[in-house]
Amino acid sequence: IYPRDAEQPMKEEVLLTSPLEYTNEPYAIAKIAGLKMCESFNLQYGTNYIAVMPTNLYGPNDNFDLERSHVLPAMIRKIHLAHCLKEGDWEAVRKDMNQRPVEGINGDSPKADILNILRKYGISETEVTLWGTGTPLREFLWSEEMADASVFVMEHVNFKDTYKEGDKDIRNCHINIGTGKEITIRQLAERIVETVGYQGKLTFDSSKPDGTMRKLTDPSKLHSLGWHHKIEIEEGVRR
């Protein structure tokens, strides 16, 4: 929801200060409309809606679908499958493919078909290929901590706590929920490789797009209200 060229880390007050990322504009506008609706209801009718803006989430029951998943669960699954291939553990490969078929190929498909579809997604016994240079920075929050932060906000925060008393214009009263810490995609992939125990090669295909180079929220407002995250990315990946 924040502007394409917003200063990093992104504070709540940078909302609507410059153009949005063009490819993400409709999605961002829909979210911003929800934030503004809550804010306006509070100001006009005295309601007590609190809007929050989470960073990238990961955790239990994540989406590991190679065709549609986000970066972290996609990397975990790719490296896990490559490790299984490297170890010759076809029982684990077939179990994984039965749980989450890829383009119609499942664990009951012929071995050659499974290997071919995995290669299409950069997965082989000797190598895992990921898109981009690996240099973009991203922030990740354990999903259960998002739930914890949301409950904390509902129980301990009121609308009047989200802006400075005496402000002429009351706006951007939402609260960022994040860690305020970032990691490169390469570092993240290397952590996953280490955790899984994969002994193959990790390759980045720089002919593919990197996406936005940096996305980091500033959670200082939430910190001032009394909530801090506890689970770091290393522990989250192990879980």
Task: Enumerate the language-model features and the residues they cover.
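Catalytic helix-loop patch of NAD(P)-dependent Rossmann-fold dehydrogenases
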Residues: 1-58, 62-68, 81
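Short, structured secondary-structure boundary patches
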Residues: 14-17, 71-74, 223-225
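Amphipathic alpha-helical recognition patches that constitute DNA-binding helices
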Residues: 25, 66, 70, 74, ...
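A structural signal for well-ordered alpha-helical scaffolds and beta->alpha junctions
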Residues: 31-34, 68-72, 181, 185-186, ...
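Hydrophobic alpha-helix immediately C-terminal to the catalytic Tyr-X-X-X-Lys motif of short-chain
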Residues: 33, 37, 41, 71-75, ...
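Hydrophobic, aliphatic-enriched repeat segments that assemble into extended interaction scaffolds
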Residues: 45-59, 67-84, 128-131, 145-155
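C-terminal substrate-binding subdomain of Rossmann-fold SDR/epimerase-dehydratase oxidoreductases
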Residues: 81-239
